Amino acid sequence: MPSASQAPQGLHESIPEHSQQSLKQQWLAILSVAVGAFALVTSEFLPVGVLNDVAGDLGISAGHAGLMVTLPGIMAAFAAPLLSVGIGAMDRRYLLIGLTLIMIIANATVAYASDFNVLLAGRVLLGISIGGFWATAIALSGRLAPRGVGVAQATSIIMLGVTLATVLGVPVGAWLSGLMGWRMTFLVTALVGVPVLLAQIFLLPRLNPDKAIRASDLPALLIHPLARVGMIAVLLIGLAHFAAYTYVAPFFKHSSGFDGQTIGSLLLLYGAAGVVGNIFAGFAANRSVRRTLLLVAMMIGVSTALFPYFATNLVGAALLIGLWGFAFGAFPACASVWMFVVAPNDVERGMPLFVAMFQVIIALGSFFGGRIVDQLGTSMLLALATALVACGFVTVAVLGRKVSNRLAAQA
């Protein structure tokens, strides 16, 4: 197993798109994308923290309210490949800026929605921003990496925005909803996007693609057997996570009997653990992405398996939600680094389809999770999630046994 200093060149070294900028400017550029990821993920998963409030205010079930998570995922699945092909050779900097503007408009639409249908229209609009952003930002992480920062670390820097969103976004969203209502919470999120937009306008360097992505480029990752193995594992583990985590707040309320403040604190713990997990993944995945993903799957599976039995008391809930948060904080970075390892030359071309698949996972997970919660309850949902994670673990352990970070150096 190589040490950090012996990491594969494809992961250890950056591929700077902005080599003429100062080191400070390079760091500010990648941080502006990380902050954009924070704002976007806060917007995407804000309903997780306010699900009970929205459902109660609009007189709908928690499962029905879960469409606020499902519809953006569906729209993002279409937007990722369509935008990537449709924009041709456009400077990706302008795309990122435009998508941040769409995010602001989408959140404002939800805040002022007159009924649930208008609210969902705003969430569909958000899906466009989500799909386009992820198809662009993750694929360009290596080109935005400051001097001396590897691709795995650059990816984890951007993904840090995601995990910080779970620390500050979802829990603070739940807290703000209790303080001033869920509508004002979405309006505040829209306003937070304004400085993010300005930061990207002034800080992002030119991000011209090597060549325009064509429709025939989208399946680029699918031609690699080990990339397909990674996609299957991500599908199984991701479905389990999003099906279960979307309805954690209702579980805490109805099964554990926790009040809103306690639920917000537990979600904050989840996010804080996720930050640690994300940082851990930036280093561990650089050594062995396969072993890191196996550890992540095992921790998520243990969490979902024990949740119905031990998360009904505060200590058990805190321990399990912390373990779950740490594991999932590492998961997105592992998924991206896996693709850099097994298909380093095809990541940018194939990332839009990978992002589309990930968004389908979010949509299907929250959708079927909602149906299961409404019909069978959260305990059955968690049991099914555990089974899916176990299948993902076996996929990585057996079908992915040939995956080694040395593959990136050989490409």
Question: For the regions a protein language model found, what residue spans apply to each?
Answer:
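Helix-to-loop junctions at the C-terminal end of transmembrane segments
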Residues: 79-92, 277-289, 373-374
